[in-house]
Amino acid sequence: MAVGLGPLPALHPVPGFELGISSAGIKRPGRKDVVVMRCAEGSSVAGVFTLNAFCAAPVILAKQRVQGTVRYLLTNTGNANAGTGEPGLAAARRTCEKLAQLTGVDASAVLPYSTGVIGEPLPVEKIEGALQAAIDDLSVDNWAAAATGIMTTDTLPKGTSRQFSHDGVTVTVTGISKGAGMIRPNMATMLGYIATDAKVAQSVLQDLIRDGANKSFNRITIDGDTSTNDCCMLIATGQADLPEITEAKGPLFEALKKAVFDVCMEVAQAIVRDGEGATKFVTVEVNGGGNHQECLDVGYAVAHSPLIKTALFASDPNWGRILAAVGRAGVPDLDVSKIDVFLGGVCIASQGCRATTYTEEQGSAVMAEEEITIRIELGRGDCSETIWTTDLSHEYVKINAEYRT
């Protein structure tokens, strides 16, 4: 059950960026599981990728090719093509070569992406057989269909759009994402595609998606597992009649940055809201850190704790588990007497122990809500970080126990 996640909003077409969807039947006959995306000539493309050492074959190829001329992005679901060694790389190359042959571009202009079961050979022939139908389906209006086509254990498609005006010209930013389990991106299984019709130099675009992902996709976690296949791509087609953005400054850049960051944040949080088996959307705020890293260490210690996550599922205000997680986060010379912890607006622990004003009824009322904020005040400095996560339910265990059956 997705928490606070409704139907897709209107996804505005991005001039110069087309999407086509078809069925290869990788896991189930008839399922739409191949997505082809076409970038207009002259587009800039940038991306951030998983830091998992066992990164998938398509990640290796996409990282090698992203700074060159990119015309097509090819995504398949149902098979991750990870843990497949040299045969996996050869398979990824073959699918790119087939798409290049069908579209008349160089194979190096095709970036591959895969998501699904790890360790199984990529069904190259099935994917090749579905490419022409996806090419024939290419349209700027296919964002919603593509958002569904990249899903795996997701229960709902995820996407959003932003538009702004500069010098009388409307600029569009639209993005989609997928992911519901194996989520702790570090650039789980997470894929994101964002496109704009602004014209942006590749170096500026790369910094933009790196910074945008760092404050959004890299601040979500469902189960703490970093996927072999994480990718988030940003494409600038340059079709808007505006000057090229060559520096990270100025009104046009700032407007684009805000739109891209907003899209990143919304589709990243949508992944958490649709987390496998999730019944709670949880914001973990850590304030008063001596540096940003210790805020993240504390936040992730709380967000990854199975004891806290199961208490959230049970709506049990077991505040001692939060204190224990903060204490084991590895923050050097942590003075627990300065720490305050809040559930929503309720102070549950102050100066390292139970707050004198706290009652179980107050805590239970907060924990019964679908959206919960855990706020931790460290009292060590001025740094803050925010992480978004879920509870841990019976359904999460069931989904992952039955994933390959």
Swiss-Prot record:
Pfam families in the record: ArgJ
GO MF entries: glutamate N-acetyltransferase activity; L-glutamate N-acetyltransferase activity
Catalytic reactions of this protein: N(2)-acetyl-L-ornithine + L-glutamate = N-acetyl-L-glutamate + L-ornithine; L-glutamate + acetyl-CoA = N-acetyl-L-glutamate + CoA + H(+)
Keywords: Acyltransferase, Amino-acid biosynthesis, Arginine biosynthesis, Autocatalytic cleavage, Cytoplasm, Multifunctional enzyme, Transferase
Subunit comment: Heterotetramer of two alpha and two beta chains.
Stated family: Belongs to the ArgJ family.
Protein name as annotated: Arginine biosynthesis bifunctional protein ArgJ
